[in-house]
Amino acid sequence: MTNLFKKAAVFTDIHWGLKNNSIQHNTDCTNFVDWFIETAKKQNCETCFFLGDWHHNRAAINIQTLQFSLRGLEKLSASFDKIYFIVGNHDMFYRDKRDTHSVEWAKHLPNVIIIDEWFSQDDVTIIPWIVGDEWKRLKKMKGKYVFSHLELPNFFMNAMIQMPDYKEIQSEHLNGYESVFSGHFHKRQKKNNITYIGNAFPHNYSDAGDDKRGMMMLEWDKEPMYFGWPNAPKYRVYNLSDVLDDPAGLLLPDSYVKINLDIDISFEEASFIREKLMPEHHLRELTLIPIKRDFTDNNPDNTNTQFESVDTIIQTQIESLEVGTFDKKLLLDIYRNI
């Protein structure tokens, strides 16, 4: 039997057009693709797998974003013998069918194979975003590798929230495969034979402090290797007291930083700190967050205190809805795609 690839370079969830079609984000995507290609060539990778969510906005693609993403895929097309390009949920116009998606045009590029239907060849299965009851097929399937864009229960959607179990697709349905590699959840994580490889680079404060993203290199029948993009933007949350003790060590270039004001300072002092630290450490964003005094007074040592992001709060509230009142899976999907 021939192998589908010798050495493959793999990445996922780049989300061109994120942050209201931010030029900064699209430029980051371009720079990531350049680094990805350079690293793949150093590792002698002839094949590329993209595991889904090329674009972010599923209803409409901004023309400038489209130009950025087209240039990125043209670079990939010129750099690999074959590119297996999975259609993710953010690439689809409809939630429940894959016949209309934002990367249809890519089939005209040399070497690009659009995976908008299940693909099996040479002991490898490639699975796009699953719709309907397609997941039932997995129970009888087996092989060496799966590349996919799966939404499996009990894996982390972000640093704090696990995917609920809706009693449909289960990790055990993939037991017939040696190794499963997936996009969709941005946090790199592994359970048994299933690995979410982590997205291209951090995108928001849900990724704060977690830089294990970038690309995977997989040589056939070998263990995967992971590479982080050295110039990836980073997200951090600190207390002001810690930043003042070690600004050079904590404030990294091209970072997005939130600082909790855990010490008493005036508005003028806060403004001065922000105006000084941002250019001095080449930060992209610096936000100062006041801490309510009544909260800290009632809990002076901050014991048993957990700070939650807006994402965490909303997703927890959706999960707490009464069974049968709403389709919680649909509500979560709608919220994550906003």
Regions found by a protein language model. Give the residues of each.
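Accessory, non-catalytic peripheral segments of nucleic-acid enzymes
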Residues: 3, 220-338
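Short, conserved loop/helix-junction motifs that constitute active-site signature segments
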Residues: 76-79, 139-142, 171-176, 250-252
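Conserved catalytic scaffold of divalent metal-dependent phosphoesterases
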Residues: 69, 87-172, 197-200
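Structural motif
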Residues: 8-10, 49, 126, 145-149, ...
